[in-house]
Design a protein with these regions (language model features):
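Active-site anion-handling motifs in enzyme catalytic cores
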Residues: 1-275
Length: 275
């Protein structure tokens, strides 16, 4: 079975496909197309760019980043579950298909009792991770988690944190799974709030974003560009430090998480019996 996922650059959310699926799916997964069966898994992949051939098994995927899937793609699809109610509504599915993002399965695979030696961490969206942002985090007294680091390293750092500030959605999903309170922030126009609400609504969590300045690296070479970068960096550092001390962190209920995990596992068990 071909595992269809975003592969152009490493990113925690996309890499979770290779980390999680072998633990829950019995069918061997391939990284190159060619199989008659396609697993469409973790990520915002339900759009017009779905593979043109094969049976598409949709397991927790979200809609976005383009137009709706073509009629041909939908005819070839076996939807087992999707990321949330926004995706289900967009595709005209019964709301019962909106279970959650498969990233919550980390609750089943990971040590939930890691030593908490990180007070507060920050995990940016993968399009905005660089040394300048890491430096600003350190100056704010906040631990920086690189979203392109290996899955095991990201999971370990989130699990060791008492709190997580994040503009990376799968950072929040991992934190929820590991029972680490999290706070969502918008750091650029690349952040898509509806993706977050799609997943969060599946766990009955209300998402309210705080804002941080967009930090580019390197700054524009002109004197004005360097001054603007310095000013934005100072604001970023100050706001991040304030957020780290705030009471706005959230965590869904154990009951709702357990309910979604149980439904997801039952669906995956049924999938394994038929493949």
């Amino acid at each position: 079975m071909y595992l269809y996922r975003y592969r152009k650059r490493p990113n925690f959310g996309d890499e979770l496909n290779d980390y999680l699926w072998p633990r829950f799916i019995r069918t061997p997964l391939e990284s190159e197309p060619g199989s008659d069966d396609v697993l469409v898994g973790i990520g915002t992949l339900l759009n017009e760019r779905l593979p043109a051939h094969g049976t598409l098994h949709v397991l927790g995927t979200g809609y976005g980043y383009g137009d709706l899937p073509t009629e041909d793609a939908m005819r070839r699809s076996k939807v087992h579950f999707v990321r949330g109610p926004i995706t289900a509504k967009a595709l005209g599915l019964d709301p019962a298909f909106a279970i959650s993002d498969p990233g919550i399965l980390l609750h089943r695979t990971e040590d939930l009792n890691r030593k908490k030696d990180i007070d507060c961490a920050f995990m940016p969206h993968h399009g905005l991770c660089h040394d300048r942002m890491k430096q600003l985090c350190e100056q704010a007294g906040v631990h920086f988690i690189h979203p392109e680091a290996p899955c095991e390293a990201v999971i370990d750092q989130i699990g060791r944190s008492r709190k997580l500030i994040c503009s990376a959605m799968h950072g929040a999903i991992a934190a929820e799974a590991l029972r680490v309170p999290w706070l969502p922030v918008i750091t650029s126009t690349e952040i898509v709030p509806d993706k977050w609400r799609d997943w969060a609504t599946s766990l009955e969590i209300e998402v309210s974003f705080r804002k941080l300045p967009t930090i580019w690296s390197p700054p524009e070479p002109s004197v004005k560009g360097r001054l603007v970068a310095w000013a934005k960096g100072a604001v970023f550092q100050r706001r991040l430090s304030t957020l780290a001390r705030s009471r706005h962190f959230r965590l869904g209920t154990d009951h709702r998480l357990t309910n979604r995990l149980t439904r997801m596992e039952h669906t995956l068990d049924a999938f394994n019996r038929t493949e």
